[in-house]
Amino acid sequence: AIKVGQIRPVICASPAFLERFGRPQDPKDVMTAPIVMSSASSLLTDWQCNLPAGSITLSPKPRLLVSSNQAAINAARLGWGLTRVLSYQVASRVSAGELDIVLQDFEPPALPIHVVYQNTHRIPAKVRTFVDFLVERLERDEALRPAAKGAT
């Protein structure tokens, strides 16, 4: 396996939403905020946060429950509430200023992304070519690079 990057569960909202409702300062602030939640993954419905004293899991009640992460992202972009998705899913929206990541200092550890293949002494040339192509592409992808805390 070759590590090519990492992703993070992130909480984000539109700048207009944050201006109207305020930027959460503590993970517990999400419990009283409007939430847009995707039912697509349990990783995104139970919100794990890291605190100095240890990890906590929040189960916010959604204002809007949607069936896909893309729908949650679109609703958050339109100001419906905070949502939690994976960092690569919102990287372009964050870069464009359409969404802001909040509570970054409380994020759980990043999840590594690997290219996995059967590593034998005789790897077929087609497989090796594809693996090399994939590794090069994924290692260049900004959305899979670690983010500096407080950078987004």
Language model feature labels by segment:
Residues I2, K28, I73-N74, R128:
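Alpha-helical segments flanking ligand/cofactor-binding loops in enzyme cores
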Residues P15-A16, Q70, Y88-Q89:
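Alpha-helix/helix-capping structural signal
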Residues I73-E98:
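A ligand-binding cleft/hinge motif common to bilobed small-molecule-binding domains
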Residues P34-A53:
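Secondary-structure junction motif
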Residues A1-S38:
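Flexible hinge/capping segments at coil-to-helix
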Residues S87-A96, F106-T152:
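C-terminal effector-binding regulatory domain of bacterial HTH transcription factors
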Residues M37, L58-S68, F106:
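Short beta-strand-to-loop elements that line the ligand-binding cleft
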